[in-house]
Regions:
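Bacterial signal peptide processing site
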Residues: 26-28
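Acidic, contiguous N-terminal accessory segments
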Residues: 32-143, 183, 188-198
């Protein structure tokens, strides 16, 4: 690229950032002439009502001294059942203040005998203060209150203990975690402020997006266990794990034509494969359908007996990739069901309801009160809702939700029979007891929120599914280009809005799929982790505040340089959206027109500046220096990868060889393995001749 063109791009970016800064510095939301100045991160604000985040922490009127002169009078007293959370509290109080906070495990505590942080001794706490009702706090809510110079921390579950621990630390020492190697304390921890906090997470199941160590998952507030049934294949697209190839031979109607679940493996033995699809109607054969329900329910019941932590199981079709090119079963019954409901979701929901009845019978007789959901994966051929339509569009009720269809079953010839309820009336197809659905719109435009026109088609499907009676919406969202892991995907500013949108329709379980194969992916994946951790807990979190805080602490003195790079990447992607599009399964993001060589080279030079900005820590705080240097190194992988793969002809043979060696070493040393979902980096580097 000519230098003049490069300068023009930089000038354009500079003008945009000048106006962005002008807008950000104003005290209100309007400019002097009444025209708002739009920035990349200036999106319409949505707010979800009815959440519980009642936080009152008063440092101006402290009720005690938490630590002074290298000591504390406080002891953390915890129920032994919550040792993980209470140890976490003691550890970080000690780290923040430099004072050892002793931890004792007991089921009782005499508050008059000393100064205490009482953690999870609920009978004592309830006898001392009035705690919110269980229906308000739910399973993971908590209540924290100072009484005199004691701190009482109430919760009712291990997940609640985790969140209560984080809230307590935020109040006492200003705790936060941006990544496993970036923990901050914004308060000195010397005074004990007056505290009264009642909170409940907006999503109970907050699943981390990218590959993450357990310490980070805990410290950032992600749910430790999803409760989703895990088989040998995983926790999705795994129904074939309930069958053998003998089942395919003996019960061919349980599968689409040509299905293979097991075959001879190279070197002997059997290997599991997923070719074809489950048939959720058993080809319309009533006896085979009943046998299928019995087969599945017996195996699920055995799992429930042995795995008390299992809360959910996905009812999902196989993914269409590799050898499997079958989207759905095309037997007469399945085709008739698809034509009637307009989606595979009708057959899947009917199957899930029938299966749940058998599983619920076991639960009622043997484990009354146990929560277990069969979750229909609304994905691909099942994405659309099995509800009433009018002129090809979803018919909605007065609340803007789908109107259920009458349920029909279909026989081997595709003829339909109405299903009657216990009163002999036509049954409506809704989510029965212990049945939910998970929305997984892999073809949506995930650089735009579901409030925006770009996703109206997919938002309408969520609104339609919402009429089918499930109290909890499960969401499988997407937040990176799966064909180009190393490229930045410009969705940062819409993450919170999507959390809000899904919450408005009952969102309670969310998994935003990211680079699940890489530990330290570039493209500001760590920023997404941080935004996700906050937004899943409180959907009304402020995006700009989160981004500002992240850069301030994650990069320290290098923050201005790295923020400028981040802003330029966002603007560059915004002005090139007509090229990249927003699909997560597309190669548009790596189009050469989006990443001119001079622009990428300029960004690469900025990382040298960033590294120089943190050099002072090399001698004074080696641990901090290593963390900051690593953070910068992670982000450098993207422009280096572009130069190594797209502009190798611009360098001599020896130069490009060293660049590629250096890139590959850093990429792998950072714990990364793949450049594209399911495809390892050696698929690219094997042709680099690095020997």
């Amino acid at each position: 690229m000519k230098k003049g063109i490069f300068k023009a791009i930089i000038l354009l970016l500079t003008v945009i950032f000048t106006f962005s800064a002008f807008s950000a510095c104003k005290n209100d939301n309007t400019s002097d002439d009444g025209d708002d100045v739009k920035t990349v991160t200036d999106v319409k604000t949505h707010k979800v009502e009815g959440t519980l985040h009642d936080v009152n922490v008063n440092y101006n009127e402290p009720v005690g001294t938490l630590s002074a002169n290298g000591r504390t009078e406080y002891t953390v007293v915890s129920s032994s059942g919550y040792s993980v959370a209470s140890k976490f509290v003691s550890k970080h109080l000690s780290a923040a203040t430099g004072v050892n906070f002793p931890l004792e495990f007991a089921e009782e505590c005499n508050l008059s005998a000393g100064k205490y942080i009482v953690f999870g001794l609920n009978e004592l706490i309830k006898s001392t203060v009035t705690v919110p009702e269980a229906k308000i706090l739910g399973d993971q809510g908590y209540y924290i209150k100072t009484v005199g110079d004691d701190v009482l921390v109430y919760f009712t579950s291990a997940n609640g203990a985790q969140l209560a621990a984080l809230a307590l630390l935020r109040a006492l020492v200003g705790y936060d975690m941006m990544s496993v190697d970036c923990v901050i304390y914004e308060k000195a921890g010397d005074v004990l402020p007056a505290i009264e906090i009642a909170e409940r997470p907006d999503y109970e199941f907050r699943i981390n997006s990218n590959e993450m160590k357990g310490d980070a998952k805990y410290g950032m507030g992600f749910t430790q266990k999803s409760g989703m049934l895990q088989t040998g294949t995983g926790n999705v697209h795994n129904l074939y794990d309930f069958f053998t190839q003998e089942d395919v031979e003996n019960h061919s109607k349980w599968f689409s034509e040509g299905a293979i679940v097991q075959r001879d493996a190279v070197g002997g033995g059997k290997e599991r494969v997923r070719i074809g699809q489950p048939c959720f109607t058993a080809h319309g054969d009533k006896e085979e359908y009943e046998a299928l329900l019995n087969h599945m329910s017996e195996q699920i019941i055995e799992i429930l007996k042995n795995k008390p932590d299992v809360l959910n199981m996905r009812i999902s079709q196989n993914d269409v990739l590799g050898e499997n090119m079958t989207w759905k079963c095309t037997c007469a019954a399945c085709n008739a069901s698809y034509e009637y409901y307009g989606t595979l979701g009708g057959a899947m929901l009917s199957f899930a309801n029938d299966l749940a009845k058998k599983v619920n019978a076991y639960i009622d007789a043997n484990e009354p009160g146990r929560i277990f959901n069969l979750v229909v994966l609304a994905y691909q051929e099942a994405l659309q809702a099995p509800v009433q339509r009018k002129n090809g569009e979803y018919a909605l009720d007065e609340n803007g939700k789908g109107i259920p269809e009458t349920r029909y079953d279909f026989d081997e010839q595709g003829n339909k029979t109405v299903v009657s309820d216990e009163n002999g009336q036509p049954e409506k197809l809704v989510c029965g007891r212990g049945v939910a659905y998970e929305f997984a719109a892999s073809k949506a435009n995930w650089i735009h929120s579901f409030y925006e026109a770009e996703n109206r088609e997919f938002a309408s499907a969520i609104e339609a599914w919402a009429g089918l009676g499930s109290s909890n919406l499960y969401i499988w969202s997407y937040e990176i280009s799966y064909y180009q892991y190393l490229y930045p995907y410009n969705n940062y500013q819409i993450l919170l809005d999507n959390f809000k949108y899904f919450k408005e329709f009952g969102g309670n379980f969310i998994y935003p799929e990211g680079t699940w194969e890489n530990m330290n992916n570039p493209g500001f994946a760590k920023l997404r982790d941080y935004i996700n951790s906050k937004g899943m807990f409180d959907v009304n979190s402020d995006y700009n505040e989160l981004v500002d805080k992240f850069f301030k602490y994650y990069f320290r003195e290098a923050a201005p340089v790295m923020r400028k790079y981040f802003n330029e990447v966002q603007v560059n992607l915004t002005i090139n959206e007509n090229i990249t599009g927003g699909r997560v399964h597309s190669y548009g993001l790596s189009d050469n027109r989006v990443w001119p060589e001079a622009l990428v080279t300029g960004w690469l030079n900025s990382f040298e500046v960033a590294q120089n900005e943190i050099l002072k820590y090399k001698e004074t705080d080696a641990e901090l220096y290593e963390a900051l240097s690593k953070h910068i190194l992670i982000e450098s992988l993207f422009p280096r990868y572009v130069l190594c793969t797209k502009y190798d002809k611009s360098f001599s043979t020896s130069q490009i060889k060293e660049m590629r060696k250096s890139f590959l070493k850093d990429f792998e040393d950072l714990g990364n393995t793949t450049h594209q979902e399911h495809f390892v980096i050696s698929d690219v580097t094997s042709g680099w001749n690095l020997d």
